[in-house]
Amino acid sequence: MKKNIGLWGASLLVVAGLLGSCAEQKAPEDTYRAEVVRTSFGIPHITADDFGSLGFGEGFVAAEDHVCNIAHSIVVARGERALYHGVGEKNKHLMSDMVIRALGIPANAAEDFAAQSKENQQWITGYTEGYNKYIREVGVDNITSWCKGADWVREITPEDLFSRFQVLAQTAPRVAGMIVSAKPPADKADAAALEVPVQTFAEMADDLRASQMGSNGWAFGKDRTENGRGMLLGNPHYPWTGTSRFWEKHLIIPGKMNIYGAHLIGAPGVAIGFNENIGWTHTVSNSERVVFYKLDLVPGDPTSYYYDGEPRKMTARKMTISVKGEDGTVTEQEQSVWFSHYGPMVSLPNAPWTEKQALTMRDANAGNQNLLDQWKAMDLAQDMDAFKDAHRKWNALPWVNTMATSKDGRAVFIDGSNVGRLSAEAIALWQERTKSDPLTGEFFNGMGLILLDGSDSQFEWQAHPEARVPGIVPYVEQPKYDRSDYIFNANDSHWLTHVEEPLNGYSPLFGSEQAARSLRTRINAKLVSDTSPDGPAGVDGKFSLKEMQQALFSNRSLTAELLLDEVVAACTKVTSVIVDGEEVDLAGACTALKGYNKHLDLDSTGAVLFREWITQYKYTETFKNDKLFKLAFDPADPVNTPRGLADEGLALKNLAKAVQVMTRAGLALDSSLGEAQFVYRGADRIAVHGGENAEGIANIMAQRIYDTQAHQQRGAKVEGSKMLTDKGYLVTHGASFLLSLSYTDDGPVAEAFLTYGQSGDPTSVHYTDQTKLFSQKQWRPVRFTKQDIAKDMKSSRVLTGPRK
C-alpha cells in the first residue's frame, strides 16, 4: 500500500506541475508552451497560460490523432478537392470547389480573420502552428495513417483554418449541386460544361437541414435528479469517418478556463462539454437556416428580375478550377456561378431556371463570423446566466439547439440557430400562399421548406438591434426554456422540448408546432418524462447517473412497442402471402416476431426481421395515419399518436418482403441484431447495439457514406432491403461523443464514450478501444480533477515552438 501511495503521489506531483504551473514556468513572449498529459484512451489534458499556447498544444496533439482528416478538411476549405482528387464521384469535388470559391470563403479569409479579436487570432494561429510543428517533425512520408505521402498534406495558415469554420457554418457548400446547375436557359455553352446529378426534393431537404447529422440531448434540473443538482446526457449522432468526427480534449488555462469535452476535428475549443459549473450538448436544429425566393424575370432577359416592379441584374462569378485528371495531369475548368442580391441562384428538377422565373436562396449564416466567440464564451461561463448571455451576446450558433444544465440544478433549452427574421405580415402572406400557390405548397408541405416571393420587398428579412448578423432572429426572439425539471430535443422543432408544457408562438422558420413528431422524439419523450415507479428514473422518478445511462441504452424500440403485437396477431391468421408471384410462408416469421423483445440489443432475436419489415414502409409513413398507423396524430397527445396498425394486408405483404430479404441474405428469421449489425475497424468486426430512426429508438446506429479519402467498408446491397448488405448492416454513423454528466457537492462527475475511438490512425491502440467498450455498454470515467488525471496518467510532455 505504501508503495502504491508513493507512486500515485509522484504522479500527482508531476501532474500538478503540468496542470497548474504555467504561471511559474511561463514561456518567453516569443515562445509557445503547452503541457500535455494523456490519460487512458488517449485523452489529452492540455494546459497553457494563454490562448495562443493552448491552440499550439491542441493543434499538435490533434494532428497526432487526425492529421489526415485535418489536412483533408483544409483541402475542402481551400476549394482544392478537384486539384488533388479529381472531379470526384458525380463531379462532387468539382462542384464543391466551385461553390466554396464562388462564395468567396478562401478569398475573403484574410480579411475575415483580421476582423477577429486578438485573442481569437492568437488561438487560431497557435493551433495552425502546432499542427505545422507536427507536419515538420514527423514528415508527410512518415505518417502512419491513410494519407501517408500525400501531396495535399502540408502546412496550413490561420486563414485556412478560419475558412474551415466558414465551411462548417454555412449551408450553401452542402448543396453545391443545385447551385452549380443553375444556369440561364440561353447559356448553352456553360450548361454543357458540367454534368450535374439530378437532386430530388428529399435529398435537397436533407442536405439543407444537415439532417444526416442527428442527435439527442437531455438536461435535468434539480426537481428530477436524486441529488437535486443538474444532470446532462449528450448523444450527438455524427459520422464515424471523415472530417465531421469529434475529438475529445480537456483544455486548461489556470485561473481562466477549465473545460472538458469534444469538438469536430480541426476546430479549437470545446463545442460539447462541461466545466466546474455548467455542462451542455447540442442537437441539429429543425429550423430553416436557408429560405428560397422565386424571382419573376424580365422578359427577354433571364438574368434580370423584377424587384418591387423595377428590373435588377443578377451577377455572374466566373470560377476557374484546377482539376486533376486520371492520368495525373492538371487542367483548368471554367464555369459561372450566378447570384441574386439574396444569394446564389439554384435549380431543381421541378423548378428549373426558365425564361419567366428562377429560384435563389439566402443563407442566414453567410455573414456569421462569431462562431468561435460564442463557443469560447460558453466554455468560460461559470453560471447559467453567463452561459445564456453568451448566446444573447454572440447569437452565432449556426444550426444547433443547446441543452444545458448547471451545478445549481437548472435545465435550459435554446434554439440558437440562425434563421431569417420575417415580419408578421410576410409570415401570414406566405402561409396563405402555401395553400394557393402550388410551388410554395410543394416546398412546404412536401419537405417543410420555405419559398417566398423574391420580387416583393416585404419578404426581406427585418433588422433587429440585437442581431449580430443583419436580418437574423436575435436571441430574445428565439425559442428557449429555463426549468427545474427537464428539457430534451431529438432534432424535431422546439415545440415538444417539454412534454407537459410545449413551446408555442415562434417563427415558423424555427420549425413546426402542434405537428407530428418523429418516433425517435417520441421515445426520447417517454424516457425523460416518465416518473412512474417502474419508469427509467426508478421508484422516486428522479434520475441518478446510472439510471440516465441505462435509459439511453435500454434500446427500446417504440415502433415495436406500438405495432409488434398487432403484426403478430395478423400473421397468426394466415399461413402465407403472395408477393410478386411468389408464395411466401409466414409461419417462421410469425414465430420469430413472437420472440422479439422489442429492444435493439445484441441478443435481441427477431430484431433484424422487424427492421426489414418496418423499412418496407416509407419513412414519412411514421408521421401520419395512412398506410402504417391507424389513429391520427393528436396535438393533445403527441407522444402516443399516431398509433395502431392501419392495414393488416399491407403489413403482411411487407412482412413477406422482409422474409425474402432475410432469405437472400442467408440470415435466419430469428437472427439477433448482434449477428447482423457491425462496425468494421481495421481488421476488427465489432457487433454494436442500436438502431435506425424508423425503429423509434434513441440510440442511433446508421449507415452513411461520408466526405473522406479514407477507405470505408462497403457491401453489396441485398435486393429488397434499404440497408442490409452482404456484410450485414455496416455502421458508419450514429452515437459518437456520448457524455453523461452529474453535478455533485464535490463537483462534476462524468462518464463517456467516443464510440469510434480517439484516433483516426488504424495503427493506433485508440482506433478500436472505445468501440469495444461501447459494444458492451461499458461507460468509461472522465478524468477531470488533478487527482484523477494523476492516477490515470499514461504520458506527459511539454510542447514548445516559436510564437507567430
Predicted regions mapped to residue ranges:
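Bacterial N-terminal signal peptides that target proteins for export
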Residues: 1-9
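Bacterial N-terminal signal peptides
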Residues: 9-17
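C-terminal motif of bacterial Sec signal peptides marking the signal peptidase cleavage site
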Residues: 19-21
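Substrate-recognition/specificity elements adjacent to catalytic centers across diverse enzyme folds
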Residues: 28-243, 250-256, 260-263, 269, ...
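Second-shell loop/turn segments in exported
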Residues: 57, 106-122, 360-362, 372-378, ...
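Acidic, low-complexity N-terminal propeptides/linkers enriched in Ser/Thr/Asp/Gly that mediate export
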Residues: 120-240, 406-471, 475, 480, ...
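Glycine- and hydrophobic-rich flexible loops that cap the catalytic core of alpha/beta enzyme folds
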Residues: 261-263, 273-277, 282-446
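Proteins synthesized as precursors that undergo proteolytic processing into mature forms
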Residues: 373-399, 504-569
